[in-house]
């Protein structure tokens, strides 16, 4: 993996030179476009669209379009793209990941390729990590696009389908990865064209691409429906497990995130439940409840892995610290946690539709992304998404100072030192950003700061709504901001305060909204922005004198990239700044990988709790542990993709056929083929032995009569003379006769329905029957595939490759599902024929 990264970087130098040249060419057009009137500049959009309609490609209008958007941004926002931002925009247009340091203006950079690609009229999706950023960027950057005559939409979690449809119809659509992915799944569950909201997957620019395509790639998007009834055993085991003892009744492997029940534990549970054998077939499900209850107790920590809000257990992303709204753990794990927390236990869910983010984003014809830290994942982005990472130079030299890690024996000593350091920094007016790994730790530190009388803001999954306001003020003199991991990522920490966001907050407080009254908002913006910038700049000078933003990490993350992201918040755009990590021997990463060796050494040397050590051994151990975890996570994501690739190919077939049926006015050919293939399959099964006397005609006619009412008597067919002498009937003759008979019987249904409501009526009935059958069979297939995947690992014990077995058996199951769709559809349609006959008989009587 790491060797590939080096190879990828070799070609990067040539790409950067090319981007430098492009940026120079765009800047050379600056005076020409600055001299255009507003009307002339706005007219460029129509001109570009006409040229594209005339046969020109995007690359031919590339430089002029970039120059147009750059000038528009200056007139509307008062911001002009730097040379390096033009380079970043070009990298995005060519379908790369632009690695741009924090504070280099990724949001503004995105305006250029979004405008250019929107000119084709096929839609551009700008993907962010949360609703707030999607709405903010659609409003702020959307002002540039709307000025140039483009429509801008935004997808938010609380929108209705008609609002979503309108947003996707816009030239440029902002939204989160979750909302876009779930809309894709919902579209492929729609029963009519009018229910669809998306219009295709042309070009996506993914902001914080590493967070979305890598950190969240292990968790699939799942739309699920409740399974009837919730088991009482979730509560039963939630009461039993706390009375059990770790390492006596059960064992836990924190590194592998697994649990195992010991013999003493089995005996204890059997005694509590009053049963003789926990592993008896009739009690097999109880083992799953027990394991989940132990995992809920030992491996899932409140305010770290999840939070409880309004009586609901909500998952917290371990990398970003954000709440994963709408997602639930599967296989009963979520219910076990609900039982542990004594909140309402919601029904177990059955998967209705699912897709991984990896496969969702590979739907796009062109994909690009932006991030501040992609170098460590360059190989993965290339292997899985075919994306090259190009490091864009900074606008000014980086002045950040990364101080040596300080390691303490205990958590208490570490946090005491952290508070002392924060107090010292704030006294001289230096702003401090503190990174924690969980909601629990952020709130613990908040309590310590409150006791010391240090004013601060907390930014975690519980305070998600105030994210932008808190981050906008995190660069003020003496400000202290405590954040989980990368909560607040996507919003710049500007020394002295972020003038654009602070002004936006101020204008909204006065009732001005850029969507509802763009003219009034723009007028106030233009009038007040210079004063706000000056005020922030004056405060920023004071902060620079105090040393710039100080970033303090309270624990190393298992991914180096997350640590680098935290450090990257400091020293933006050539500002001064410094960073330091405070560690303890009881930190999760240290416990899992460094082990007791270092702690024993500190004890032998009689190192006091409040005295830190600076050790190369510790630093190297941490780096080794992080590299080990990164490799494990990469392999896990590759493994997820390998297994999902089987489902992905099947999903593409089903969704493609489903969409074709939705869009076709006449699906009679599908139905005719289904009739022929179903009847043929029956005949093939009955005549497999070859000789007429060996055919299982009783079985064949029983199957046919369950399907429809054959008008042919099989005795006449076999013994009659229609096909020559008695006994000369071939399997092909039988198939032809029965297929023709089934078609003739179906024609009677078509005739009967058409007589009532015209030919369109039978076509509508066919669609109304077929779509639910497809959805039901697909849902059942997803369940069967989940079940197959759960047990497929056991095939390794028989010296067989689990993946190969999964591919083979999954393929067989998929073919069986398709046959089931045909058979059930034909059966239901012929059932309508029987109902018509019954009605006719009743009328005759």
Swiss-Prot record:
GO cellular component, one term: cell envelope Sec protein transport complex
Keyword Protein transport: yes
Compartments where found: Cell membrane; Cytoplasm
EC number: 7.4.2.8
Sequence positions that bind ATP: 85, 103-107, 492
Entry-linked Gene3D superfamilies: Helical scaffold and wing domains of SecA (1.10.3060.10), P-loop containing nucleotide triphosphate hydrolases (3.40.50.300), SecA, preprotein cross-linking domain (3.90.1440.10)
InterPro entries: Helicase_ATP-bd (IPR014001), Helicase_C-like (IPR001650), P-loop_NTPase (IPR027417), SecA (IPR000185), SecA_CS (IPR020937), SecA_DEAD (IPR011115), SecA_motor_DEAD (IPR014018), SecA_preprotein_X-link_dom (IPR011130)
Bilayer topology annotation: Peripheral membrane protein
GO MF, one example: protein-exporting ATPase activity
Catalytic activity entry: ATP + H2O + cellular proteinSide 1 = ADP + phosphate + cellular proteinSide 2
Biological-process GO terms, alphabetical: intracellular protein transmembrane transport; protein import; protein targeting; protein transport by the Sec complex
Pfam families (alphabetical): P-loop_SecA (PF21090), SecA_DEAD (PF07517), SecA_PP_bind (PF01043), SecA_SW (PF07516)
Enzyme class: translocase
Keyword tags: ATP-binding, Cell membrane, Cytoplasm, Membrane, Nucleotide-binding, Protein transport, Translocase, Translocation, Transport
Assembly and oligomerization: Monomer and homodimer. Part of the essential Sec protein translocation apparatus which comprises SecA, SecYEG and auxiliary proteins SecDF. Other proteins may also be involved.
Function, in words: Part of the Sec protein translocase complex. Interacts with the SecYEG preprotein conducting channel. Has a central role in coupling the hydrolysis of ATP to the transfer of proteins into and across the cell membrane, serving as an ATP-driven molecular motor driving the stepwise translocation of polypeptide chains across the membrane.
Family per record: Belongs to the SecA family.
Protein name listed in UniProt: Protein translocase subunit SecA 1
Protein's organism: Corynebacterium glutamicum (strain ATCC 13032 / DSM 20300 / JCM 1318 / BCRC 11384 / CCUG 27702 / LMG 3730 / NBRC 12168 / NCIMB 10025 / NRRL B-2784 / 534)
Gene for this chain: secA1
